[in-house]
């Protein structure tokens, strides 16, 4: 993650979510407004939503989504979720498990034979739970190469290293590599690319109309909020890095209202289980 990017904050209530109400204007809150003061005004901004019993009790944008033209952040602004994206990758895998197309204890190499022999014992469950022992693909990238890598490039990088950080299942270590591989597994098991699968099975059914696993040249991000860094006394756009095009670990864009729909769906699922 690059520093000083535009902030996206979602604070969810602790009680069960019953549904997703239409957008409402909420009065100022001195406590929240005070916390968000650094993101208010003519600076890269943030969006905050607080839900209580599934209903929005606070929804507000602060600052700017696009510094160059002064576009303000609103509840509809779409931010890059970065690692918050991983929950959608995990959900896609579990949908395919329900479909009978994947098994949590299947070897990852069953779907990704390009992985080296050292990865033979890694299961899909271990990729999901950050216990695979995979190397971090960012450590394998050439620092002199400024081209963006994609999920398939992550597999290529890992295939060249016949070693792990530890034996699968013996330790926990947060793994971006694992979720990039899971996105590829979703594609191979479903017969559709990862972004299309998410649209068809998660985003569209839940009414998350503005959420997208973004691919330059393939789709666009509506009402997009960009990231910036303060360089030489001015805000300069630093929205994309060499790893921003990897979808499975961090490439999804979404808004407050769409994430409220996602939270409502998760809570309904939990309620149905009980």
List PLM regions with ranges.
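Bacterial N-terminal signal peptides
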Residues: 6-18
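Short, surface-exposed loop or secondary-structure junction motifs
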Residues: 66, 119-272
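Positively charged n-region of N-terminal signal peptides that target proteins for export
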Residues: 1-4
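Short active-site loop at a secondary-structure junction
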Residues: 39-47, 68-126, 164-177, 247-250
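Bacterial signal peptide processing site
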Residues: 21-22
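Residue-level preference for non-acidic, small/hydrophobic
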Residues: 32, 36, 48, 54, ...
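Short, conserved catalytic-motif segment at the N-terminal edge
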Residues: 26-81, 101-106, 156, 161, ...
């Amino acid at each position: 993650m690059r520093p000083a990017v535009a902030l996206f904050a979602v604070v969810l209530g602790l009680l069960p979510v019953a549904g997703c109400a239409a957008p409402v204007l909420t009065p100022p809150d001195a406590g929240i407004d005070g916390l968000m003061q650094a993101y208010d005004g003519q600076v890269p901004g943030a969006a905050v939503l607080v839900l209580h019993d599934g209903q929005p009790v606070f929804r507000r944008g602060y600052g700017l989504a696009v510094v160059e033209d002064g576009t303000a952040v609103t509840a509809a602004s779409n931010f890059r979720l970065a690692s918050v994206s991983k929950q959608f990758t995990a959900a896609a895998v579990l949908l395919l498990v329900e479909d009978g197309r994947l098994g949590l204890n299947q070897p990852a190499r069953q779907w990704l034979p390009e992985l080296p022999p050292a990865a033979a014992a890694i299961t899909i469950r271990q990729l999901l739970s950050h216990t695979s022992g995979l190397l971090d693909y960012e450590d394998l990238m050439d620092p002199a190469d400024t081209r963006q890598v994609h999920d398939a490039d992550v597999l290529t990088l890992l295939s060249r290293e016949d070693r792990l950080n530890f034996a699968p299942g013996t330790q926990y270590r947060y793994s971006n590599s694992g979720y990039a591989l899971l996105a590829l597994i979703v594609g191979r098991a479903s017969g559709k690319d990862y972004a299309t699968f998410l649209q068809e099975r998660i985003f569209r059914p839940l009414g998350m109309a503005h959420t997208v696993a973004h691919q330059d040249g393939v789709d666009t991000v509506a009402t997009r909020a960009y990231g910036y860094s303060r360089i030489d006394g001015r805000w300069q756009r630093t929205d994309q890095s060499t790893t921003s095009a990897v979808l499975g670990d961090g490439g999804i864009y979404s808004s407050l209202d769409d994430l409220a729909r996602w939270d409502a769906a998760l809570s309904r699922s939990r309620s149905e289980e009980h």
